[in-house]
Amino acid sequence: MIRKAVIPVAGFGTRLLPITKAQPKEMLPVVNKPIVQYVVEDLVEAGVKDILFVTGKGKQAIENHFDVNYELECKLEKSGKYELLKIIKEIDRLGNIFYVRQKEQKGLGDAILYGEEFVGEEYFIAMVGDTIYSKNIVKDLIKAHEKYGCSVIALERVPKEDVYKYGVIDGEEIEKGVYKIKNMVEKPKVEEAPSNLIITGAYLLSPKIFEKIRETPPGRGGEIQITDAMNLLLKEEDIIGVEINCKRYDIGDALGWLKANVEIGAERFPEFREFLKEFVKNL
């Protein structure tokens, strides 16, 4: 049973400046909820209820969001706004939330390493805090882990010309949409990429990954890449990749954020979908 998750959220969100100058990108709204709430909801729905945020300077809004706000709850109750009160209380009850601060930003691998004491000797989920999926892929990772008994990562097939933006895998398909991974390359040149299957930022990892992160030398920009650590892990353990069968919203830049709001808004709010239809007609 997978009980724990680590969510690194210490990054500055520079590609979304100036909106992220004082606001964590993970707290930007997608329709009526902040990005990171979607991530936490998927984890809790999949049974992963102990969640560690690896934070940094200026991320207090995340802690405030998942904390109890007694003053607000009292005000809503006195005003008779019981539906809003119910929504707020549901956020308070989303799992068991813990925090640790990453003192220096040295890459995703280093951020995940901050979860070692929290995780202990268990397999765990690691997810980036700025990506939303149109279905619960945490359940898919857990299902694959239960079948194969090893680390599992989420994969997505992208156009070949886009592989330079991502970590890319070389692997053998062992059943439809499932790959036994041989190697991983971080942001390869298009002509050198081993495939067009990219790592999406959702991982189910063996606790042995912490040892491998410590063994991983810093790469470009002094960052410790989780892909390099997983390549070291591959020498001792299998890693399986599962191709996601859903939409992924990478909200790392303004266009991605806008797309997520439009598509998720149109899906969840019929009146907004009708507005969009009329709006597009008049463009």
From Swiss-Prot:
Catalytic activity: alpha-D-glucose 1-phosphate + UTP + H(+) = UDP-alpha-D-glucose + diphosphate
GO molecular function: UTP:glucose-1-phosphate uridylyltransferase activity
Annotated Pfam families: NTP_transferase (PF00483)
Gene3D superfamilies named among the record's database cross-references: Spore Coat Polysaccharide Biosynthesis Protein SpsA, Chain A (3.90.550.10)
Top-rank taxon: Archaea
Statement: the UniProt record of this protein carries the keyword Transferase: yes
Signal peptide start and end residues: none
Gene Ontology BP terms: biosynthetic process; UDP-alpha-D-glucose metabolic process
Annotated TM spans: none
EC number: 2.7.7.9
Keywords assigned: Nucleotidyltransferase, Transferase
SUPFAM superfamilies membership: Nucleotide-diphospho-sugar transferases
Family label: Belongs to the UDPGP type 2 family.
Descriptive protein name: Putative UTP--glucose-1-phosphate uridylyltransferase
Originating organism: Methanocaldococcus jannaschii (strain ATCC 43067 / DSM 2661 / JAL-1 / JCM 10045 / NBRC 100440)
Lineage of origin: Archaea, Methanobacteriati, Methanobacteriota, Methanomada group, Methanococci
